[in-house]
Amino acid sequence: MELKSTNKAFGGEVRKYTHASTATGTDMTFSVYVPPAASLAKCPVIYYLSGLTCTDDNAVQKGGAFQACAELGCMMVFPDTSPRGDDVADDDAYDLGKGAGFYVDATADPWAKNFKMYTYITEELPALIESNLPAAPGLKSICGHSMGGHGALTIALKSPDAWASTSAFAPICNPTECPWGQKAFAAYGVDGAAHDATTLLKAAGAAVYPDILIDQGLNDQFLAEQLGVDAFEAAAKSVGQKVSIRKHPGFDHSYFFISSFMADHVKFHADALNKKAENALVDVAVTDDAALAEFAKTAGKPIT
């Protein structure tokens, strides 16, 4: 893992790294905000997945997350949206290939060789972060925008024990029923139903998280054709999943919209991460009799 740049922000650091990925078979780039609290203890991590055409730079430069992360002691990780490189397959269209990995593992050529973004986000990158940065093991949440909102919701719904919470800005909620999703799933050779948030929530048959936060601009040019927020809302209602969908008149699909509500999402995840950390401490106190017995030997005694 190679550090490429560092910038101070709100008492912490914005760092950009590159590393050789075993999942994609390419060098991958990500950025991370390390809050000032990391100098004292390991911090919980929020993963932010970006949308079509983006790199890690878009949200870093325009998302407005750092002040809230600094105040609440959360690290935030910004992965790239696809593998890149001269030998990586691409398409002339903006919604396929580089910048459009859709957070799935492709099985069809020419994409199967490198486009393993599901494995990269769910396995390789968290392990890398927890091994090399002051990240609290297992304390992570996930959010995203548009294609990244699709990735955040589906990844969290498929593995609820791995994530404390999930949220999204203008997510692609029902990709099997929209042109973007249908095109990507067909090209990459993946089972769309296994990567459709609406379908996954219906299949769960019950609430998966205490709450899911979604912000949606009502002037979003993609709302009617591509996003499927109403379908996700209906699925949530049918299984008893609380979803806080906030619909905002006048807001579009851009980072002007995202930055207006980013702090709310950081707070939403910080609360969930803190609760998960507290529950983990309770679990240890209740179940780890050996640890309690060892602690009792030293209680009230000087430690040398």
What are these regions (language model features)?
Residues 1-304:
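Non-catalytic cap/lid and distal C-terminal segments of serine-dependent acyl enzymes
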